[in-house]
Amino acid sequence: MKRLLSFCFALVCSSLLLFAQTLPTGGATETTPSKSEYFSWINNTNEGPTAEQTLTNLRFFQWLHDRYGMVLDLYAFDAGAIDGAKIYGSMRSERFKKQFPEGFGPLSEQAALSGTRLGIWCGPDGFGSTDSEAQEREDMMASLVEKYHFGLFKMDAVCGQLRPEQYNRFDRMMKRIRQTDPGFVLLNHRLDLGPGTAHSTTFLLGGEETYIDVHMTNDFTATHHRAKALSRTSPKDLTRLTEDHGVCLSSCLDYWEDDLVLQAFGRELILAPEIYANPWLLRDDEFPTLAFLFNLHRDYRDILVKGLRLPAEKYGHEALSRGNATTRFITLRNLTWNPVTYEIQLDSETGLDKKSKRVKVRQYHPYILDLGYHPYGSKVQVTVEPFRATLVKITTEAERDGIALSGIPYQIINDRTGGTTEVKLLGMPGCTYQMTLERCTQRFSSATIDGKTESALLKGQKVSVTFPGQKPQKDFHRHLTTLQPCQVPNDAESIYYATCFAADNNALEARSLKRSGETRIPEVKAARDAFFNQSLFQGRELWDRYLFDSNPTTAFSISFRFGDSRTNSSSGFFLDLGALTELDEVIMESFDEYSITPLKSEEGQNAYLSADLQHWTPVTFRSGTRMHIPTKAAGAFRYLRLPDCPFRLTEVSGVRNGQSVDRSKWHASNLFRTYGQGGCQATQAWKGQFHLDEALEGSYLCIAVNGEHGAEGAWAGLKVEGKYIGCPDRAPSYKCNPWEFQSGNSEKNYTFYIPITADLIGKDLEAWTLTFNDQQVKPEVWITAYPIPFQQKELHLQRK
């Protein structure tokens, strides 16, 4: 394996040296094709990665390569592999040897199996105070490229600035590295490198990190958390020699693919597509989309380097066209609550030269759809759904896609590996589509739809495809009602608590795992387990699961790493049993006296129990490190709350007839305020009524609270036939006990989300908004769906 790796790398280096004279000192020009990258920040934080976890992650990317043909050019270690925050390291240190017992060799070899090179986060200095120390640093950094074939350094001011007296040493080191690899990528994050700045390939665009609802949060209402990310713009001159920090796949994952389309095909910087953190947290059915976008970009990356900004008055915010005179990719977006239809001009306005009488138009996102041939100079209409992006190709060339269909929306699952091209056919319930197979680059010997042979498709004939279900009578995305001011209701407390019990304060990554569900893919499961089983993830005590794991060494705690994250330093403890339950007692355990703060041992406390969020039964117990809360007299209950939450709890359990009960449906939160405490008292209310007679799969309600309301100053919920339904999600996200950094917030324009379940259909619903101050807002309710509520069939085409 090592001999093969060295041979392959020698071939790469030889080809690079042939055009070394054409590359500038920074290793790339504005027309250098992009490189795809993953970097590991948030998969680990400043403690750094380990060899074991990295191998697991690399095997995940190898699975994407082997299953879908996806190629990742660069896998970059983030902080802590060698250097760390405010400190330089060495590959000879005990710390490094503990993290990487066999060094970088096995990792470089694993990466090479799927065509990937490693990269690393580091500082620009570390040259010490003597010539020998400086030489040791230079040799170590150069060896990463010369011996282990690294392709990227991400140099960050978090480690430290380059001392002026080391400018020449840095310049010498980088010249040595570029002798080995002229196209080596050097990312400059907020550094003054003096004369060595010329070695920088990129600079950080706007200084923005893209961890959703941590460093990038919505400040306007929207159907999802990533709307602010979708509003990002490219540099004014469309320079590509900058870096936008990529697309974070760790938190608030819905609509991630729109974010990636705009990053890869819109901004299309020198690193694109660029992702980071925890892509294994996507759902199993989303990995084909991830691979498809990487593959599509790779197919066309040579021409995507030339960009054209389209007139905003015609094409909307930050519409871009990329490509050459015969093929263009156009990115459109819609940052409003209603669908927007744009007219794409098929001529020089969008970058096409007149070399053909007709232009082929195909949409690639949010699904693939043939939009037909049109005369050069004509217009074609494309509708962009609310708070979404759309990717369209216009071309006068012959089709380059391996598989191309017309007459039906579809997504490509796999057209690269194995002998079968797999396509997901999409259609609305109860609708019929006339599908044809277009001339494309692949040739096929057989075709089946859901296992049924469809030979007519291979003969160029139309095939009728009908999807099950009842045809929708209304748009899946629509406005339902505008809430009107009213008196604060007597049950405002119940409306408030419904959302406290529906939501959680877990780390954002734990929320993403819940969103995506179990995986059937071993490589995905291994990467998830490697992340969540890290000792630091457990040690930071940021997941309510640790209350119910029968492990006295784990805990769920109020995080104070970044100060007091509670609103007005106040929060209660909320426990949802998941169903009405009869218990003799609830037992809460903690480590020590400090951990039960603000409670004090042997003092009497009240807990409150409820079956319906409206009627609460107080019970008295004695506080301590093991608290027995008597619940038998209250009868069946589902909800338990403490007005004041202990800082740290290790276990919460229930006992019935002397036996511990199952806790698999239990969950808890610890950052929400008790109603009536810490400024949490409704002073204004808005109410809206509507009848929900139709909702497609994946539908959810958006209660958009438009206007200024202050941080944590607005709340929302539903009432249905006297029952209270909370909002389990909100943008910006509810407060969390964070893994990497504290969650962001906004003082305006919250959007609360409620998934639509079958028991809501055909019912009269009341939507409520409460505010805790005197500011005026304008709440309204929308219904939408994610993903688009298509039914699906699978088309399999056996390749010749």
Regions inferred by a protein language model and the residue ranges of each:
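C-terminal beta-strand-rich structural cap/linker in extracellular carbohydrate-active enzymes
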Residues: 369-422, 428-433, 455-499
